[in-house]
Amino acid sequence: MENVNLTPKDIVNKHFKQKMRGYDSIEVDEFLDDVIQDYETYAKENQRLQMENDRLLKKVDELTKQVAVGKTGTTARPVSNASTNMDILKRLSNLERHVFGAQLNDDVNRGNRF
């Protein structure tokens, strides 16, 4: 907590001079007790939020690294996918030639019989 002038202890330990016709010291003490409780609550909440912020920043760093690693991995995949697709196309072409080539030979042979 930067630029904080008072801590809860400072508020508790603060003593005011008493003058005639001044404020009721009991009322001031009760009010300061409430201020101290609120101040401590805000300090705890601030600390909790800072810890959560640190945790989330670490998580962002981890996820950013994972994305960076994932991007390098995906650039390598299309090359392997392209070679796999080319291999599949070659096999399909050979299979078609074999199947349809045999049918063409059968059709030619049948045609000669008629």
From Swiss-Prot:
Residues 32-69 form a coiled coil. One of its GO terms (cellular component) is cytoplasm. One of its GO terms (biological process) is regulation of cell shape. Keywords: Cell cycle, Cell division, Cell shape, Coiled coil, Cytoplasm. InterPro entries: Cell_cycle_GpsB, DivIVA_domain, DivIVA_fam. It is found in: Cytoplasm. Its main location: cytoplasm. HAMAP family: GpsB (MF_02011). Forms polymers through the coiled coil domains. Interacts with PBP1, MreC and EzrA. Divisome component that associates with the complex late in its assembly, after the Z-ring is formed, and is dependent on DivIC and PBP2B for its recruitment to the divisome. Together with EzrA, is a key component of the system that regulates PBP1 localization during cell cycle progression. Its main role could be the removal of PBP1 from the cell pole after pole maturation is completed. Also contributes to the recruitment of PBP1 to the division complex. Not essential for septum formation. Belongs to the GpsB family. NCBIfam families: DivI1A_domain, PRK14127.1. This is Cell cycle protein GpsB. It comes from Ligilactobacillus salivarius (strain UCC118).
